[in-house]
Amino acid sequence: MELHLALRASPLPAADPGRRPPPPRGNFATNCTAAINSTHISQEKFRSLDSWVEHNMLTFLKPVEKCWQPQDFLPDPSHLSAEELGDAVREIHERAAEIPDEVWVCMVGNMVTEEALPTYQSLISSVLGGTVAGSTPWDRWIRGWSAEENRHGDLLNKYLYLTGRLDMRQVEKTIQYLIGSGMDVGVGNSILCGFIYTCFQEKATFISHGNTARLAKHHGDTTLAKICGLVAADEKRHAVAYTNLMKKLFEVAPNESMLAFAHIMRAHVTMPASRMFDGRDPRLFTHFSAVTQKIGVYTVRDYGEMLDFFLKEWEISAVVDDLSPEGRQAQEYVCGLPEVMGKMAERADDRRKKLVNVGEPRYIPFSWIFNKQVCV
């Protein structure tokens, strides 16, 4: 599902991923609570979208019988002899042997994030105020979306286990720690902030899984490449659904949506997997993020391009009606962000080059790969 949305310009941020970020700064969002309160949409406006969700969002969910399932890509012990099963696993081992350690770190980090789905479902349900068995279009979307997402962690977990390249007990501990730690992403109970946040999550996850698919293919594991590609395709479909929803919300509640967009961009919102922990490394998420930046799985430049995409898709600069003075200030702020992100990406590239050219490279051990060290 979601990933680290924005990476800092430095390849190894100094901030402890377990700490809450500083409060947002600026004239119109100095108080986080006040900023979130300004983004609330009325129940009347929100419920007016029930029919729209029914006909324009639920259609992005696939019938279960037409969905791929994890078992489609795994050896099936019920249909293989012991010898055939052993051969199938050996083939997976042989393909996996060619994949570098840093790619496995990214694969595991992505999979662990997917496995924390219960937290994400709880977050969206709490923001929407839905019920477990509710029949509204919103309730059905949440359950259907979660059901599709659930296959991602299942498949990645099982396949990575079969590669023999990972310390699965450490991976499993990381998953349990992450789900148990909960998540406060800084959106309060704002529906609009929650949906904008999720738009970025789904888009970032699509990018990340797509890039791991490319790397797996490059190193010769076409099956793993296909698996990551299928997950990326699901994430892209979900991202389109959430992006279309926010475009509609900008039409229905332009001022509240603009303030929500600015809040998400300014508040240094905690990333979904920022509490990632394996029982050993308190800066695990920071180190994982540094690896994704280094090998191009997810970078500052990706984040900047993603931001630019949403600005254009939601036609932010063209919103003129029903904006308060604060809304116009928020609009000006978010429209100026691509230039800022471009400079951040350039600084990140420059710092990376300096680290390569000056001094010894830095290596970090990851328990997921039996404490082998990876250059960050």
Swiss-Prot record:
The entry's keywords: Chloroplast, Fatty acid biosynthesis, Fatty acid metabolism, Iron, Lipid biosynthesis, Lipid metabolism, Metal-binding, Oxidoreductase, Plastid, Transit peptide
Signal peptide range: none
GO BP, one annotated term: unsaturated fatty acid biosynthetic process
Domain of life: Eukaryota
Cofactor note: Binds 2 Fe(2+) ions per subunit.
Cellular component GO terms, alphabetical: chloroplast stroma
Transit peptide: 1-33
EC number from the UniProt entry: 1.14.19.11, 1.14.19.2
Annotated tissue distribution: Preferentially expressed in the flower labellum.
Single GO molecular function: stearoyl-[ACP] desaturase activity
Pathway named in the protein's UniProt entry: Lipid metabolism; fatty acid metabolism
Record: residues binding Fe cation 2: 149, 202, 235, 238
Annotated Fe cation 1 binding sites: 114, 149, 152, 235
Reaction catalyzed: hexadecanoyl-[ACP] + 2 reduced [2Fe-2S]-[ferredoxin] + O2 + 2 H(+) = (4Z)-hexadecenoyl-[ACP] + 2 oxidized [2Fe-2S]-[ferredoxin] + 2 H2O; octadecanoyl-[ACP] + 2 reduced [2Fe-2S]-[ferredoxin] + O2 + 2 H(+) = (9Z)-octadecenoyl-[ACP] + 2 oxidized [2Fe-2S]-[ferredoxin] + 2 H2O
Subcellular location: Plastid, Chloroplast stroma
InterPro entries per UniProt: Fatty_acid_desaturase-2 (IPR005067), Ferritin-like_SF (IPR009078), RNR-like (IPR012348)
Intrachain S-S bonds: none
Cofactor(s), names only, from the UniProt record: Fe(2+)
Oligomeric form and interacting partners: Homodimer.
Record's miscellaneous remark: Flowers 9-alkenes and 12-alkenes function as attractants to the pollinator Andrena nigroaenea by mimicry of the bee's sex pheromones.
Function: Converts stearoyl-ACP to oleoyl-ACP by introduction of a cis double bond between carbons 9 and 10 of the acyl chain. Converts palmitoyl-ACP to (4Z)-hexadec-4-enoyl-ACP by introduction of a cis double bond between carbons 4 and 5 of the acyl chain. Catalyzes the desaturation of saturated fatty acid 18:0 and 16:0 to generate 18:1 (delta-9) and 16:1 (delta-4) intermediates, expected to give rise to 9-alkenes and 12-alkenes, respectively.
Similarity-based family: Belongs to the fatty acid desaturase type 2 family.
Protein name in UniProt: Palmitoyl-[acyl-carrier-protein] 4-desaturase 2, chloroplastic
Species of origin: Ophrys sphegodes (Early spider orchid)
